[in-house]
Amino acid sequence: AILTFAQNFTIDDYEKEEVYIEMRDGAKLFTSVYTPKDKSQKYPVLIKRTPYSVKPYGADTMPQKLMHNTELVASGYIFVNQDMRGRWMSEGEFENTKPPYSWSDKKRTDEVTDSYDTFDWLKKNLKNFNGNIGQY
């Protein structure tokens, strides 16, 4: 049997990047990306989209912890936190509980299209991303 040992990542093992991800209608959503400093392997992404702020803001400002589940942090993920449309540092108009629109209307936006556009950007722009995304 082959034994593998997961690296135990802590907040000190991550670097932070802040980006604005452009949606299909041109609105830019503020996004904090926390990537493991170890670039020797590829990692899955866990993304949180929230109306309640992804602070702390500032590329050199790290949170006290990336998430409450320390086992996930220790396992090594790319963590992505995004201010939802129209909230905090993101552009656009916030609409609480907006119903999803039909995919046939390419100009209308909702939380589904914003998630899709974000996932697409991550897939195309993140280095060391293994292609797996989970949203929490």
Label each residue range with its predicted role.
Residues 1-4:
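Bacterial N-terminal signal peptides
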Residues 127-136:
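Alpha/beta-hydrolase fold nucleophile elbow
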Residues 42-125:
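Cap/lid segment of the alpha/beta-hydrolase catalytic domain
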Residues 7-41:
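N-terminal cap/lid segment of alpha/beta-hydrolase-fold proteins
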